[in-house]
Amino acid sequence: MSKNGAADALKTFELENNIQTIDHDQLFKYDPQQYQQFLQSKPWSKDPHYFKHVKISAIALLKMVMHARSGGKLEVMGMLMGKVENNTMIIMDSFALPVEGTETRVNAQVEAYEYMVEYLELIKQTGRLENALGWYHSHPGYGCWLSGIDVGTQSVNQQYSEPWLGIVIDPTRTVSAGKVEIGAFRTYPQGYKPPNEGPSEYQSIPLSKIEDFGVHCKQYYSLEITYFKSSLDQQLLDKLWNKYWVNTLSSSPIFSNRDYITGQINDLSEKLEQAETQLSHSRSSILDKKKEESLLSKVSKDSSKVTIEQVQGIMSQVFKNSIFNECQTTKQ
């Protein structure tokens, strides 16, 4: 029963994240000479939006999610391995870094850089020729975007280590055996003013983080993410999933995320108070009414998100109860 449950959950995970199976292994081939020619041409220096797409292997995705979840409320950090094909960045693998994280930031010390250099040297000895292509870190409970510190880190790396990608994962908002909350970003060159773009997809950001988000949101852009796997990945993916599945079954988002849930409700309360204050002081013009509707719409979306997350947490508990407790009752 547990094997069937794990297999079904893995299929659900692949469907929710739209992981595509590739029929050939061309994507895994690496041509060092061609890559060096690409680096020398530096097409990204002529177009700040040159890189538009990211392809992430299912193994790299699952390793990042497992690492992010292991950090709990603390931020974690790791590296991305891969290559570039035209305007697409392909992430083949990822590995964790030994860093000191807090609830709001993650700092890489000398030991982490030494570990990274040694890891990259050893992995090339095994025949893996992919290069470091970026970094990832977690934002537990407050969404996928770049803070001021993140923008600074990404900008420095793009200046000296191009091509370079930044990925953010929110393990708290990632639904067990469901869609991964993830974002891939690149910063603009200093002094560059991006064109006015249409409204991006709304995401809930805590009131305490909105200022940091708003100040820096025009300094970077997001890339479209897709996922892939090959037939060669399946065995390793199954083993990784079994470990992830055990952790999922042995934990409950309702209990493990109690502080996050409380924070969400408090944040929603503060946003409602803020909306009420602004509504009471606003004039009855058409422009003010549009602002009021936008503000109330965002609060409504945040409220719906909190409700959906709680329902999903309850459903996961019901699912676990039907697997274990009812099976034991039937046997007795």
Curated annotation (Swiss-Prot):
Component of the CSN complex. The holocomplex is comprised of 8 subunits csn1-8. In the complex, it probably interacts directly with csn1, csn2, csn3, csn4, csn6 and csn8. GO terms for cellular component: COP9 signalosome; cytoplasm. The JAMM motif is essential for the protease activity of the CSN complex resulting in deneddylation of cullins. It constitutes the catalytic center of the complex. The lineage of its organism: Eukaryota, Amoebozoa, Evosea, Eumycetozoa, Dictyostelia. GO terms for molecular function: deNEDDylase activity; metal ion binding; metallopeptidase activity. InterPro entries: CSN5_C (IPR040961), JAMM/MPN+_dom (IPR000555), JAMM_MPN+_peptidase_M67A (IPR050242), MPN (IPR037518). Its cofactor is a divalent metal cation. This is COP9 signalosome complex subunit 5. It is an enzyme of class 3 (hydrolase). SUPFAM superfamilies: JAB1/MPN domain. Belongs to the peptidase M67A family. CSN5 subfamily. Keywords: Cytoplasm, Hydrolase, Metal-binding, Metalloprotease, Nucleus, Protease, Signalosome, Zinc. SMART domains: JAB_MPN. The gene is csn5. Probable protease subunit of the COP9 signalosome complex (CSN), a complex involved in various cellular and developmental processes. The CSN complex is an essential regulator of the ubiquitin (Ubl) conjugation pathway by mediating the deneddylation of the cullin subunits of E3 ligasew complexes, leading to modify the Ubl ligase activity. In the complex, it probably acts as the catalytic center that mediates the cleavage of Nedd8 from cullins. Csn5 is essential for growth or survival. It is found in: Cytoplasm; Nucleus. Its EC number is 3.4.-.-. Zn(2+) binds at residues 137, 139, 150. A motif (JAMM motif) lies at residues 137-150. Residues 54-191 form the MPN domain. One of its GO terms (biological process) is asexual reproduction.
